[in-house]
């Protein structure tokens, strides 16, 4: 049993895509801070990066640029541009959202930031983050951390889905029976083609 406040009613038609709702709400939470600018650059084209871009578009933002080093993950179905960082000459981004999980990335992002711009750390970073203070000082850079979604974020995501503004299609890429969990975990962490893995417990004893 869980408190009713921790349960969300969803449409059965969402099917397995419903497992992405919390992550979509996390993306929306990063975008919804007071005074937040919509992303001009998103770093990382995994599931969270894709959801950030999709939710931003659902909320009326212009299409962002997305950085992705792995060419196999570069497809965006024409919704926005996905490029390798080295192929992007721009150095005046006003809002950069990082979901790469790279703890050493801040200095490189500061090089691409416009004066007064903001870097939003929306991923998870296993180690300490540091940056070159003079570089940030000269740009009067702002650094913001986005954490766990709130009820208002989930409601907004569900409203976007109901209105047809947001799709979760194409993000669950792999499925395994729960009995094959060891193989599934290896694939989820080692196969760059795996965006989201689902374990199917329907046949578990």
Residue ranges with predicted function:
Residues 107, 151-205:
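C-terminal hydrophobic helical "lid"/dimerization subdomain
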Residues 1, 8, 65, 118-120, ...:
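Structural detector of well-ordered beta-strand residues that form the stable sheet scaffold
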Residues 103-163, 201-205:
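Glycine-rich phosphate-binding loop and adjacent beta-alpha segment
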Residues 42-45, 53, 57-108:
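Adenosine-nucleotide cofactor-binding segment
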Residues 46, 69-70, 125, 149:
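Residues in the short beta-alpha loop(s) of Rossmann-like NAD(P)-binding domains
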Residues 26, 48, 56:
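Hydrophobic/small residue at the entry helix of a nucleotide-binding pocket
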Residues 1-43:
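NAD(P)H dinucleotide-binding glycine-rich loop of Rossmann-like/cofactor-binding domains
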């Amino acid at each position: 049993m869980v408190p009713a406040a921790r349960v969300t009613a969803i449409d059965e038609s969402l099917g397995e895509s419903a497992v992405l709702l919390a992550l979509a709400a996390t993306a929306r939470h990063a975008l919804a801070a007071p005074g937040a600018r919509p992303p001009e650059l998103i770093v990382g084209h995994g599931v969270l990066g894709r959801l950030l871009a999709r939710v931003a578009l659902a909320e009326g933002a212009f299409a962002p640029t997305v950085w992705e080093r792995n060419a196999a993950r570069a497809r965006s179905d024409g919704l926005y541009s996905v490029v390798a960082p080295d192929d992007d000459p721009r150095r005046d981004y006003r809002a950069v959202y990082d979901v790469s999980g790279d703890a050493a990335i801040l200095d490189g992002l500061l090089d691409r930031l416009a004066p007064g711009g903001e870097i939003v750390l929306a991923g998870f970073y296993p180690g300490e983050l540091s940056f070159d203070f003079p570089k940030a000082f000269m740009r009067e850079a702002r650094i913001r951390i986005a954490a766990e979604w709130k009820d208002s974020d989930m409601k907004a995501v569900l409203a976007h889905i109901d209105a047809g503004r947001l799709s979760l299609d194409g993000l669950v890429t792999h499925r395994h029976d729960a009995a094959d969990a060891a193989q599934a975990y290896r694939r989820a962490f080692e196969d760059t083609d795996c965006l989201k893995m689902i374990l199917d417990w329907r046949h578990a004893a």
